[in-house]
């Protein structure tokens, strides 16, 4: 990481099917080894499954799931006089989105369904309904921040 200047943000084109930037970011996070067509198949397949099961617009369910998973506060380690404190800090909007995407995909990959499309659609529907592993991860993060509220004055 350069100390002179921060890296410039790359421009991302919205996905062709829904015209949504966040779906593209999600697709890029699902992608392994540069295989974008495989990632597209997985994400679009999962969103089609969500639409057929919930009878709702898949992108709205997707955004609802992301909102339900995105953390508002997290803890960061801060060393003060030989002791390390877990200090609660607010999460920036870009990081909130990145964490939500990361946690949703990790939770989907750990599910027991046979195909990734089934796992991802199941996790998206669970997250949209405030259930599932990704939502539990957010709740745990919030609990950690709440438990360490006494150290909030160490914020930097």
UniProtKB/Swiss-Prot annotation:
CDD domains found in the cross-reference section: uS7_Bacteria
Cited PROSITE patterns: RIBOSOMAL_S7
Cysteines joined through disulfide linkages: none
Signal peptide: none
One Pfam family of this chain: Ribosomal_S7
GO CC, alphabetical: small ribosomal subunit
UniProt-listed PANTHER family: RIBOSOMAL PROTEIN S7 (PTHR11205)
Function: One of the primary rRNA binding proteins, it binds directly to 16S rRNA where it nucleates assembly of the head domain of the 30S subunit. Is located at the subunit interface close to the decoding center, probably blocks exit of the E-site tRNA.
Quaternary state and interactors: Part of the 30S ribosomal subunit. Contacts proteins S9 and S11.
Protein name: Small ribosomal subunit protein uS7
């Amino acid at each position: 990481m350069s100390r002179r200047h921060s890296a410039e943000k790359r421009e991302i084109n919205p996905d062709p099917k829904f015209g949504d930037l966040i779906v593209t970011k999600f697709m890029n996070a699902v992608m392994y080894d540069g295989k974008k067509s495989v990632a597209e198949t997985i994400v679009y397949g999962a969103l089609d499954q969500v639409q057929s099961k919930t009878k709702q617009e898949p992108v709205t369910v997707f955004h609802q799931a992301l909102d339900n998973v995105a953390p508002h506060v997290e803890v960061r380690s801060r060393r003060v006089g030989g002791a390390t404190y877990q200090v609660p800090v607010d999460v920036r909007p870009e990081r909130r989105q990145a964490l939500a995407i990361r946690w949703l995909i990790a939770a989907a990959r750990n599910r027991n369904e046979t195909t990734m499309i089934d796992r991802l659609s199941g996790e998206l529907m669970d997250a949209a309904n405030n259930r599932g592993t990704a939502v539990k991860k957010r709740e745990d993060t919030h609990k950690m921040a709440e438990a360490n509220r006494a150290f909030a004055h160490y914020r930097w």
